[in-house]
Amino acid sequence: MTFSIGSKITATDYNELVTKTNKIFADNYPASVPATNPVTRSNQAFGWGNQAASITNIGTKISANLVNEVIDRLNVSSEHTGGQYELDRVIKGQKITASIWNDIQTVIDDITPNKNTAALGQTAVSQLGVISHSSGFNNTLTYIVDLNFSSYNKGRYFFNSGSTIRLNLDKVNGNAAASSWASVYQRLGTVSLSLTNTVSTTSNIISENKGFEDLDATEQLLLTCNSRSGGGYGYGYGYGYGTGDNSYGYGYGYGYGYGYGNGGSSRRVKIYGQLIPTNGDFSSGAVTLRLKVVLTSPDTNVTGTHSLYVESNKATSKTSESASFGITAPIYSGSSYA
């Protein structure tokens, strides 16, 4: 909404801007649960879960303090998303003009498309945990990563803010089979789970294009990384000719050979995700994001120490006068079995 010079700004007008601001900075959809409906998903992608700006009553005078609640939240939001603008706060006694209102709307329009993006320098990586497996494995090794959020909405806020969960594998020591697995780990790269997708720092993976918003209580495949070695191809051809007539002799013969072979071992990493709600209810109580990393191959007696590193790339906290922005990281636990 654009205001013309001289237009009277009412409580209804103010509340409309507050609602748009809170939709991003706070949460207008607190009853969210996993959804498949595109409209519902689109709505639930809004919201960082911070303290809302105040809605005012009809007939209330729009004061500098009220307007500054909106301005402060938009300035923090613009900083976080890498926006183009920073608004000046209103001084007590200053007239609230149409120009100020239009500037606020401009900033909202700038921030909204980037609500799920954290600008460069607005996140920080921290290690949540390491799962090390050193007892060897045959054919299959499975890592279980449990990331506990106090509610489904807390998980939403984490991923809506542009925060991600990162996974990478490494090995120390071990036999030839372990060294082959180390090559697979390099191919896999660092995997990042975001709101809408699961990707890697390399191009060697097959993503299912699913992120946090796609997850529910059913386990789903998120990503695959394959490595195959070995193969052979052979081709042979021979020709001879002969015949005989009186004192002249000539011979004929023909030979042809063809061969093809494909051998070696296939090693594969698959990553799965699901959400586990307390007592099966997403609407109340804690929710665990479970990531399962499965290594499979024909290899037997793989030795060495194989470790899965789990990191949080979380939006950093920031403040601007009356507005404070903060995202809570999940509580980590992990295990492995072969």
Task: Indicate residue ranges for each PLM-predicted region.
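Generic structural hydrophobic/aromatic packing signal, biased to beta-strands
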Residues: 14, 104, 165-169, 193, ...
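Solvent-exposed, flexible loop/coil segments flanking beta-strands in beta-rich domains
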Residues: 115-181
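Short, surface-exposed beta-strand/loop "edge" segments at domain boundaries and coil↔beta transitions
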Residues: 172-183, 296-306
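Large, modular interaction/toxin scaffolds in secreted and membrane-associated proteins
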Residues: 177-214, 337
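Long, compositionally biased low-complexity segments
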Residues: 155-157, 163-174, 182-187, 217, ...
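Extracellular "spike/adhesin" assembly and maturation modules
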Residues: 1-130, 134
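Extended, charged low-complexity segments
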Residues: 205-338
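Polar low-complexity intrinsically disordered regions enriched in Ser/Thr and small residues
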Residues: 96, 124, 132, 139, ...
